[in-house]
Amino acid sequence: MAKTSSSSSSSNREWSSSLLLSPKVDCPSKTFSLLEAKSSTSFKPYGLISSPTSEVLVLFEPLRTILFYTPTLICFLFLQNFLYKSISEMSYDEMSFIIEFFFIAEAQFENFSSALQSPIF
């Protein structure tokens, strides 16, 4: 019994040493190094995007949407109540003014959000 365990352990050592001495097997598309394998398997929280300049949390996307659309919706309701008309009763000029307001507000918000995502340092 002792002989079998010693022979199996020696065969394991031979097998592992042959793996160490064997040539590196290259994948046709890419050769992975140990560092790449380690970084690809490391834990990253949901929504984390790594970029060369900064890390941006995509978890802020719902918050960003809420922060943009809530004031815009309030402004739209204010304009609607201010004009005392429903959307179906608005003229073309009034509707185009509100749509233009939305486009301007969205462009301003996109400028603000891109400034937030730019690297600080």
Swiss-Prot record:
User: Is Transmembrane helix set as a keyword in this record?
Assistant: yes
Q: How does the protein's chain sit in the membrane according to the entry? A: Single-pass membrane protein
- Can you list the GO cellular component terms from the UniProt entry? membrane
Where in the cell is the protein located? Membrane
Q: Could you confirm whether the keyword Transmembrane appears in this record?
A: yes
Q: Where does the UniProt entry say this protein principally localizes?
A: membrane
| Transmembrane regions | 65-84
Give UniProt keywords alphabetically: Membrane, Transmembrane, Transmembrane helix
An additional note in the Swiss-Prot or TrEMBL entry is: Partially overlaps SAS10.
Q: What is the protein name given in its UniProt record?
A: Putative uncharacterized protein YDL152W
